[in-house]
């Protein structure tokens, strides 16, 4: 999806047009389409996709730019009991980093960059993952309230008991916070929400138990089919049957010693399963389809030929998918809103962007900085204090 930025005031129309053209370029620079696709798989499978919207000062040869990336939920920690992650008192993003790389980046703390303040859970890999020379780096975001009542977002980075950076210790951020928007730089896209937690559950959690029953029933049905189609015999020890010839179906003759009767060799009778068990297995499959909203009308199965009936069935079958997509669009709006706030805060230098033209294959260049979207002084109060106007934009 591409954002459309709309102004709330007439004076901001030009800035809104520029943002509508520039935001897709910034998303493209961040390979957002791949991140969006990867996170959709996470959302479908595990119920939650986590996006991080940061300012990366190392981008653009040190000029800095917006950085949008996927966050692993195993490395994200929040206050228990909150449903909205923005209401959490603290937010932690942890990562395992090689100690030698940390010493190169922070040489003043050499010898003090080992330790694990947080136990980082890991996935079960086929390969052996060595974490002996890695340390847990914690990015800690927390909110405070200024004297004027404004919510400030502060940021600290530490390893073990060694503090690497704290925005409250930096005069540039002490009074304004790390990001001016005052929000945690994390956006969660939830599949099926739950009370008391900002994350949800996905299709794996929904379909796991029905699939276990389906697998067990199918296994038993297949086992019975194999037993029924493969003949076995009770053979008396006194029966002189050439077993090699008996087991080799390519030989027309099987030699025996003595007489053969039902007392010396007898086929083992295997009773086939009733049709009811196949019906039960099919019912469980249909149940899982209903639970997962994976109906035949969504995949174009035959059976209904009237156009109006097909449209009605598809409309009814798409309710779940429409809500999933709408939730991702709402997440997309939050991500782009954070991008606008980072542009407002950090785009002091004019930058050039190539945007798509009106005709196919055409393009043009536009220049942009944050002069038109920063807070603008519009007057003074009776006490002589300046009054500021902040341009606000809506995203569609």
Feature map (PLM): residue ranges:
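Extended alpha-helical, oligomerization-prone segments that build pores/tubes and scaffolds
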Residues: 1-396
């Amino acid at each position: 999806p591409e954002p459309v930025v709309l102004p709330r005031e007439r004076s901001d129309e030009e800035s809104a047009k520029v943002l509508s053209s520039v935001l897709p370029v910034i998303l493209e620079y961040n390979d957002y389409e791949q991140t969006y696709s990867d996170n959709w798989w996470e959302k479908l499978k595990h119920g939650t996709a986590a996006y991080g919207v940061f300012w990366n000062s190392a981008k653009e040869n040190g000029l800095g730019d917006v950085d949008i990336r996927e966050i692993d939920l195993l490395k994200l920690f929040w206050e228990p009991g909150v449903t909205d992650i923005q209401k959490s008192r603290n937010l932690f993003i942890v990562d395992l980093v090689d100690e030698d790389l940390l010493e190169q980046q922070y040489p003043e703390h050499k010898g003090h960059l080992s330790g694990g303040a947080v136990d980082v859970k890991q996935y079960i890999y086929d390969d052996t993952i060595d974490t002996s020379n890695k340390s847990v780096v914690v990015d800690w975001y927390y909110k405070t309230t200024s004297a004027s009542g404004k919510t400030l977002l502060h940021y600290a980075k530490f390893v073990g008991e060694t503090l690497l950076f704290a925005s409250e210790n930096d005069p540039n951020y002490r009074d304004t916070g790390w990001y001016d928007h005052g929000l945690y730089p994390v956006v969660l896209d939830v599949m099926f929400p739950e009370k008391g937690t900002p994350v949800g559950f996905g299709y794996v959690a929904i379909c796991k138990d029905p699939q276990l029953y389906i697998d067990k029933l199918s296994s038993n049905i297949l086992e019975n089919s194999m037993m029924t189609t493969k003949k076995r015999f009770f053979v008396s020890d006194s029966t002189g049957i050439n077993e090699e010839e008996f087991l080799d179906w390519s030989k027309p003759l099987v030699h025996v010693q003595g007489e053969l009767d039902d007392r010396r060799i007898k086929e083992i009778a295997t009773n086939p399963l009733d049709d009811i068990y196949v019906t039960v297995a099919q019912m469980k499959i249909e149940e899982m389809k209903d639970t997962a909203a994976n109906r035949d009308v969504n995949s174009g199965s035959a059976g209904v030929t009237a156009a109006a009936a097909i449209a009605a069935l598809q409309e009814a079958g798409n309710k779940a998918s429409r809500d999933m997509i709408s939730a991702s669009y709402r997440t997309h709006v939050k991500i782009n809103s954070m991008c606008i706030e980072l542009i407002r805060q950090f785009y002091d230098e004019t930058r050039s962007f190539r945007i798509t033209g009106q005709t196919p294959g055409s393009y043009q260049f536009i220049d942009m900085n944050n002069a038109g979207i920063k807070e603008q002084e519009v007057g003074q109060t009776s006490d002589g204090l300046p009054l500021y106007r902040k341009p606000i934009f809506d995203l569609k």
